């Protein structure tokens, strides 16, 4: 068996497809289509394997619709069967090849990484910077305007072609071309597109670390931060990075991309990181997040009181937010929120 055949087997044989089904059902087993597939999981997986081996597999037409909250965006929804196949393709062929060579501080959508790891990494960067320069220093915070809606298909496919073997690239290209019309724009809900998202800027990551020599650099998808002692040098970096992005068809969000003093604090992944005069890093939850949560809790509790939603679901929602808030220095805030949440239920048996 050659390498290409081995890669294909790792994607289309029964066991990886079955494992993908178990992964895909999480959080959506309540849907009728998912429950039906899962209840007949062995039979459906054998059928899918047979179609993939014989070359008779054809993806079903995706359903496209718009959502408006928290912001308007297009959604592409695919059948559960197609999701199972794509999950196996992503996990067993695309991701292992694409992630080779990533810098350590590319933090999104990867095994062993994520938001918690990214926050801890930024905190460590600030502490290291403090040991050399105190609180003197500057931040270049970058944000790309409409990262996924403006991602050119040829740019993403070129990156896939550069790093994937021939069989995997052919399958990847087929999936993306069948799901997305036109030359520009992807739906970030797709795992395959998320892999494109962490990969397309890989060359830029290496450029910032190895050519611009920025030691304290971190990227979470299209949100990235550079820390340096020189404001002038960071402004130079901004110009050079902007030119690199333009080559790929991207542009900065000019309102969110700026150079500023480290003393102002860095807002990243839902928290503001404040470096104190003693070198301690404090994480403060964004006030907007707290305000939104209070409104949401009020709405959910009213629904529960009317019998439209079980209290356990509302408790689960609040505890999820609370666990997130607890990642910062939020002891007093959590006490206030616990009291607010308890007061919302007053009058209930």
Regions found by a protein language model. Name each.
Residues 3-7, 90-152:
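Active-site-proximal segment of RNA-dependent polymerases
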Residues 2, 78-79, 83, 87, ...:
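Right-hand nucleic-acid polymerase module
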Residues 1-46:
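Non-catalytic, polymerase-adjacent accessory regions of viral genome-replication enzymes
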Residues 34, 38, 108, 112, ...:
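Conserved phosphate/pyrophosphate-binding and hydrolysis machinery centered on Walker-type P-loop NTPases
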Residues 17, 48-71, 84, 167-179:
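Reverse-transcriptase-like RNA-dependent polymerase core
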Residues 72-103, 183-210:
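Conserved pre-motif C helix in the palm subdomain of viral-like polymerases
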Residues 23-35, 65-76, 103-105:
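Glycine-/proline-rich flexible loop or hinge segments
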Residues 51, 120-221, 225-244, 260:
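Conserved polymerase palm-domain catalytic core
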